[in-house]
Curated annotation (Swiss-Prot):
This is Alanine--tRNA ligase. Keywords: Aminoacyl-tRNA synthetase, ATP-binding, Cytoplasm, Ligase, Metal-binding, Nucleotide-binding, Protein biosynthesis, RNA-binding, tRNA-binding, Zinc. The gene is alaS. Binds 1 zinc ion per subunit. It comes from Salmonella choleraesuis (strain SC-B67). Belongs to the class-II aminoacyl-tRNA synthetase family. The lineage of its organism: Bacteria, Pseudomonadati, Pseudomonadota, Gammaproteobacteria, Enterobacterales. Zn(2+) binds at H564, H568, C666, H670. SMART domains: tRNA_SAD (SM00863).
Amino acid sequence: MSKSTAEIRQAFLDFFHSKGHQVVSSSSLVPNNDPTLLFTNAGMNQFKDVFLGLDKRNYSRATTSQRCVRAGGKHNDLENVGYTARHHTFFEMLGNFSFGDYFKHDAIQFAWELLTGENWFALPKERLWVTVYETDDEAYEIWEKEVGIPRERIIRIGDNKGAPYASDNFWQMGDTGPCGPCTEIFYDHGDHIWGGPPGSPEEDGDRYIEIWNIVFMQFNRQADGAMEPLPKPSVDTGMGLERIAAVLQHVNSNYDIDLFRTLIEAVAKVTGATDLGNKSLRVIADHIRSCAFLVADGVLPSNENRGYVLRRIIRRAVRHGNMLGAKETFFYKLVGPLIEVMGSAGEELKRQQAQVEQVLKTEEEQFARTLERGLALLDEELAKLQGDTLDGETAFRLYDTYGFPVDLTADVCRERNIKVDEAGFEAAMEEQRRRAREASGFGADYNAMIRVDSASEFKGYDHLELNGKVTALFVDGKAVEVINAGQEAVVVLDQTPFYAESGGQVGDKGELKGAGFTFAVDDTQKYGQAIGHLGKLSAGALKVGDAVQADVDEARRARIRLNHSATHLMHAALRQVLGTHVAQKGSLVSDKVLRFDFSHNEAMKPSEIREVEDLVNAQIRRNLPIETNIMDLDAAKAKGAMALFGEKYDERVRVLSMGDFSTELCGGTHASRTGDIGLFRIISESGTAAGIRRIEAVTGEGAMATVHAQSDRLNDIAHLLKGDSQNLGDKVRAVLERTRQLEKELQQLKDQAAAQESANLSSKAVDLNGVKLLVSELAGIEPKMLRTMVDDLKNQLGSTVIVLATVVEGKVSLIAGVSKDVTDRVKAGELIGMVAQQVGGKGGGRPDMAQAGGTDAAALPAALASVQGWVSAKLQ
């Protein structure tokens, strides 16, 4: 009996654990502090800083099963998903990594043992082919002489992409940085399937399938293209879980493995589909994986960047559900079946199930309102299409009006053998794409990053001043030996009391002092294992090796500590008041305010805000001890400690507990007891995105300042109302009631004035072929009164055409009215459009009533003068 996908995943991790590898959890699909990536798309992403020498781990061998998404490039990336055997938006990448430990020999031997060993995957050796980079004789000889693969099944691949080192078998992180040759392992499905071995003209067939890529990072590519050997070569490997599952389960398509079969059956159930071979079932089964895990990792549907990619995938899935005949929202119902089929890899998704389902349901409901109308419009356009290409403007209109991502339009067209004018679409939405490009900012020169070989020991939990030694200096990202007065720099010390920005807590400020110099620290940041003090040398000179006294701004740190501890209390209180679906989605802890973003689908009620505030203040009054313990990550999670969104954790973590009320993983600085916080006040609650709320709050002196400010405002209002704060409510209600009465009386007077003005105006109408024409600019009339006046005048004049205008604060307001018996010749919408165009505006409406605005008041007299000629022509 073949292994299940879950068993294959576990077997891979178990194998490498037995070879001394640390099993590391999958990182978030949103790369941590990496602007060069839209989504995590490979197992090595979370180790990038380790490979670059910017970070160090307490292990030199690692293995992972990494969740990945590849759907964020050009908009047609999605079109093959569901239609081919191996295209996915979401997949799991199995990988093993060596950070300066083993190299080619062990990497190849490990792979061969796992794939062919009787106790592991037990694949037939004669079915395996390998490729190596053309000049990588070392790897070639290991495969031939040590592993024993015949020469005819070892293929050298050269620079097949038109440039030096541009090869399927040479891997590069970017234009600069770590790179090296790779060897790939292929599985031969047999001669009953068309295709040829890699490097042959038939290599695109499905017979020979790549199952494992083993990268040997042995060079550092310079900006001029030179390849410098790395001092410690490393290994990065990747094997698609779905691909190896297809091989081990003896199927040719990834969609036929157990995981997808189960999901496809679930899709059929919720959509009512009966043909399990329908491609739309495969599309939806793939898309629920990427969408659910993206939402769980904090991505929300939007029109920019990651959120737009998510929106595209959701809407493509919904449209395929529509094709299957789904009559109601269905997509969110697949989260439960997905959690079941993912097993241990779906634990985080299970914790956030309610939130994920709500986000997907809301997005589907919003799109469902326009899907039918958009499809009808597309059908109309395709029915009258001359040729085989839909114009880009129509594709853009579908996107702009109906929310159709262009790949969804392309999907529909593809089914009818019609192409989409992509160039025209790109031109039509240039502004939107420009914003997305600016925000994504991909591509980086990795050699330009600050690289610190040394490590800094943080001692700020117990000290606010400390003597240390300068181990490195950087100016404009470049290492220097000395800095002089007036220069801005990054100073690295061997040990420091300064806290580097992390976990939402801002970096410390303060001073570094020594013999004849003073360095003002404006911020503190992490650079791998080093802590950098950013600031400016105000006096003297500072050089590498100098002794310094590091002094943290104590008062500022104290305020930060209170705010950070209050953030933990508020997080726990929110989960008690709103529910356990509340999860942190971001935070900022500064000396002035704390800001906390969390998952929740609606605005908090005033009573809920008060309840959270009261609950936090109750814990402050309890004066609970705030304690920290260092323990293994798994033990901390078993204890119930909550992990913070987007944070990376070592295997040994710091667990912060506040009595029995709150337990979280946290490396920040905190008060000693909850009573130190003094007072907690929420100053705002707002939404930042669909399903995400934000609270801002203050503590201690800041909270007291808000109390005093509120009291002062109340006293000022009481003074204005000639009362006191005790009877302020009654006074305000009386003023509001009097105001309502006066507004009512004022409106009555305005109505009377308008009626009188209408009566006066009716005498100014001129007769055009039996139709009364009235055109007038009115002074001192509010724009909203114009409609009432037109209605009155139509009743008085009978067959009539009316144009009225008024100017308020330089802005022109226009209205046109046409009696119903005249609308066959004069339409109010056309008339008002003609006038509005002359005053720099636009407008529209019904044939009998239309309104418009404009910005050019000086042009109004001429515009009104043109009405009589225009109407006369229409009445001929």
